UniProtKB/Swiss-Prot annotation:
This is Uroporphyrinogen decarboxylase. InterPro entries: UROD/MetE-like_sf (IPR038071), Uroporphyrinogen_deCO2ase_HemE (IPR006361), Uroporphyrinogen_deCOase (IPR000257). Homodimer. It catalyses: uroporphyrinogen III + 4 H(+) = coproporphyrinogen III + 4 CO2. PANTHER family: METHYLTETRAHYDROFOLATE:HOMOCYSTEINE METHYLTRANSFERASE RELATED (PTHR21091), UROPORPHYRINOGEN DECARBOXYLASE (PTHR21091:SF169). Its main location: cytoplasm. The keyword Acyltransferase does not apply. NCBIfam families: hemE. GO terms for biological process: protoporphyrinogen IX biosynthetic process. The lineage of its organism: Bacteria, Bacillati, Actinomycetota, Actinomycetes, Micrococcales. Its EC number is 4.1.1.37.
Amino acid sequence: MIVTALDPTHPLAAGLTHASRLVRSYQGERQEVTPVWFMRQAGRSLPEYRDLRVGTRMLDVCLDPAMASEITLQPVRRHGVDAGIFFSDIVVPLKLAGVEVEIQPGKGPVFERAVRTSADVDRLSAVDPAALAADTFAAVQEAVRLTTAELNETPLIGFAGAPFTLAAYLVEGGPSKDHLRARTLMHAAPGAWARLMDWTADLSGAFLRAQVLAGASAAQLFDSWAGSLSLRDYAEHAAPASARAFSHVRDLTYTVPSADPDGEAVVRAVPIVHFGVGTGELLPAMHEAGADAIGVDHRTLLDEASRRLGHIVPLQGNADPAMLAAPWEVLSGHALDVLDRGRAAPAHVFNLGHGVPPETDPAVLTRVVELVHGWRA
């Protein structure tokens, strides 16, 4: 593989974030203080977010660099978390590639035309992600640059939807409880399914790469719907596409100078995280797709997840979001149990098993951050 060095001004290459607790944990180095951030930390649980969103549409906000940056920064300022997670939506790259999609409040992404046949896949893939105009992701990259300029030594995590989840949305035409149509296409028209997965992989990969090149210090794929698949179907029909998406950022590297004046500098790759919902049985396959760290949802205990991964993979997770509304003695006990079980992995980044519920009291999240930062293994 030919490697590509990040620009010297990139936060990793410039020495701002390469030694952060988050980046080092993703690379397998256990930290004295466990890093913590929350999926959907930027969102409806924050009053400042709700104020900013009045009268706006989700996709418009995602493509407004100043607003996307401000929303990304809000939870970092409020909670003191160890990372920002770029504020966007998994359908943004689809929108930028010309797919007609809108996010309907209370429902989620809704597509003008579902992708149900081989002809539909051919129509969609007529737009080659590799041939998109150079400025396709310009608004996204500007938002990343604005954000990292304020974050300084706090790393920003870039994110994208995993190829299977994007494909499932496209085939279903919107949200689904069982993703039956997607699984049907997978088996009824395997050739069309493979082309669809290659296309979503390249689009997700390009979206991730744009964020990393603009300043993100890590990259995470979110596979919200992978839990609907058997291990066999995931390994055969989804994991190769995730690996293909990761390949778009796997070549990006930076150099860390040696602490020893006579030592040699070390070249490191941008860390990659793979998270899925309901994927306890899929964890080894998710890791084999090329991730450095694995996100675990709340259904699988972290020590069990580490066992399934041979105790060699850094883990992220996995407090139950429902616990955020429980009394503090219940929540704190749960968080401490997560931290204790996380010791089974070589390194651990504390997070939730899914996103922050909109009704969560922000003060509770701040208190969880303080608890995690005060804990010692």
